[in-house]
Design a protein with these regions (language model features):
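Single conserved hydrophobic/aromatic residue that forms the stacking wall/gate
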Residues: 1-10, 14
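Structured mid-domain segments that build the active-site/substrate or prosthetic-cofactor binding neighborhood
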Residues: 12-45
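Non-catalytic C-terminal accessory modules of carbohydrate-active enzymes
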Residues: 28-36, 51-194
């Protein structure tokens, strides 16, 4: 997982080697995850390939596809994690809920975004689970995310606007939240390229 860390700008480094980086990311999600042997316990780490969703330090990895112009892949994987790693049940989380990170991942991603690098005021847009989410801010401001044509089938983003202006990259800043912006996301059932 350290190989895929972004804390010091790894995304920028890998932009120069985009195909190699995408290959590394893809291999993480497609590698064999079978558990074998007499002393093997059941998987509680939420494996998708070798991506362990129950291991909180890897939560940012899905959003790395946005940094290498594969936002549709981020959208697919966020959708897959919603459906395979979370349930309204006693055992509804993979891994464990230490420090609230499992829930934090779900809350932010279900609103349609995630902060890939803590402390960096940039958010990566993924796949919203809700048609509308509102964050109430001081002074009566609101940060609103509206997902149009959102459904289980429509997991891909067709277009995005922030305060009515088209977004050509799947990112926005913390200042956009604090300003009380509106992020509108048009969903579709087909992959789209930036």
């Amino acid at each position: 997982i350290r190989e895929r860390s972004v804390s010091r700008g790894l995304g920028d480094v890998y932009k120069r080697q985009e195909d190699a980086f995408v290959g590394k990311l893809d291999s993480l999600f497609t590698a064999d995850s079978s558990l074998e042997g007499e002393t093997t316990s059941s998987d509680i780490s939420g494996l998708i390939g070798q991506y362990a969703h129950g291991n909180e330090p890897s939560h940012h990895v899905i959003h790395m596809y946005n940094y290498v112009n594969r936002p549709w892949r981020t959208q697919e994987l966020v959708d897959s994690v919603y459906r395979s790693q979370y349930a309204n049940a006693v055992d509804g989380l993979s891994g464990n809920e230490d420090c609230g990170q499992m829930s934090a991942w779900y809350v932010l991603n279900s609103m349609g975004f995630y902060q890939v690098c803590p402390g960096k005021p940039v958010y990566s847009i993924g796949r919203p689970a809700f048609d509308k989410a509102v964050v109430n801010l001081p002074d009566g401001k609101k940060f609103t995310v509206i997902a149009k044509n959102n459904s289980k089938k429509n997991k891909y983003i067709k277009s995005m606007t922030l305060n009515g202006k088209p977004l050509d990259k799947p990112f926005f800043t913390h200042d956009d939240i604090i300003a009380g912006s509106t992020l509108e996301i048009e969903m579709t059932d087909r992959r789209t390229q930036p």
